[in-house]
Amino acid sequence: MGMRMMFTVFLLVVLATTVVPITLASATDGRNAAANARVSPVISKSSKKWCHPNPYTVG
């Protein structure tokens, strides 16, 4: 294998490893946003009910 061919293979490997995590991250962000939109009202209601407004104060 020549130097040019090895460099091309190296670039392809680098591009493949950077493109796949970016596409996976954007796909999971969409799913997480949809799930968080549904769950956040429930969490906010329960946190108001059970959590003290300022946990660092006594009383």
Curated annotation (Swiss-Prot):
Cellular compartments annotated: Secreted
Annotated signal peptide: 1-25
Record propeptide residues: 26-47
Pfam families, per the entry: Toxin_8
Top-level taxon in the UniProt lineage: Eukaryota
InterPro entries: Conotoxin_a-typ (IPR009958)
Subcellular location, principal: secreted
Keyword annotations of the record: Cleavage on pair of basic residues, Neurotoxin, Secreted, Signal, Toxin
Molecular-function GO terms, alphabetical: acetylcholine receptor inhibitor activity; toxin activity
Chain's role: Acts as a neurotoxin.
Similarity section: Belongs to the conotoxin A superfamily.
Protein name according to UniProt: Putative conotoxin
Organism of provenance: Conus imperialis (Imperial cone)
Lineage: Eukaryota, Metazoa, Spiralia, Lophotrochozoa, Mollusca
